[in-house]
Amino acid sequence: MTNLLNKSLEENGSFLTAVYIFVGFVALYLLGRALQAFVQAADACCLFWYTWVVVPGAKGTAFVYNHTYGKKLNKPELEAVVVNEFPKNGWNNKNPANFQDVQRNKLYS
């Protein structure tokens, strides 16, 4: 750094070297302001999407779930089927459920 400064002082003189250093600091200042504006805009964008999309979406999803799937059915026979008959661990189920064919009164799996 001092080598560059000494070279500039020799070739350009002290006044132009001071001007170049000043212009460099102004450029750094403007770059910082541009980055600050960019970060502020990105922050406002994230805050907008979080406030108007993410939170209402999560609240809406919770509302729909609580008033549909999350609601207790108060139908014991249906709840017994849901709990006891359907496979509990997907494709790894060793005991597949028996479903009753209502019209033929026959069990098949």
Curated annotation (Swiss-Prot):
Stretches assigned to the Virion surface side: 1-11
GO CC terms: host cell Golgi membrane; membrane
Membrane topology according to the record: Single-pass type III membrane protein
Gene Ontology biological process: disruption of cellular anatomical structure in another organism; viral budding from Golgi membrane
Domain of life: Viruses
Role of this protein: Plays a central role in virus morphogenesis and assembly. Acts as a viroporin and self-assembles in host membranes forming pentameric protein-lipid pores that allow ion transport. Also plays a role in the induction of apoptosis.
Keyword Transmembrane: yes
InterPro entries in UniProt: E_protein_CoV, IBV_3C
Bias (Polar residues): 90-109
Protein name: Envelope small membrane protein
Chain segments annotated as transmembrane: 12-32
Subcellular location, record wording: Host Golgi apparatus membrane
Coiled-coil region list: none
UniProt keyword terms in alphabetical order: Apoptosis, Host Golgi apparatus, Host membrane, Membrane, Transmembrane, Transmembrane helix
PROSITE patterns membership: COV_E
Residue ranges that the UniProt entry lists as topological domain Intravirion: 33-109
Region called Disordered, residue ranges: 89-109
Keyword Protein biosynthesis included in the entry's annotation: no
HAMAP family: GAMMA_CORONA_E
Organism: Avian infectious bronchitis virus (strain KB8523)
Family the UniProt entry places it in: Belongs to the gammacoronaviruses E protein family.
Subunit structure: Homooligomer. Interacts with the M membrane protein in the budding compartment of the host cell, which is located between endoplasmic reticulum and the Golgi complex. The cytoplasmic tails of both proteins are important for this function. Interacts with Nucleoprotein.
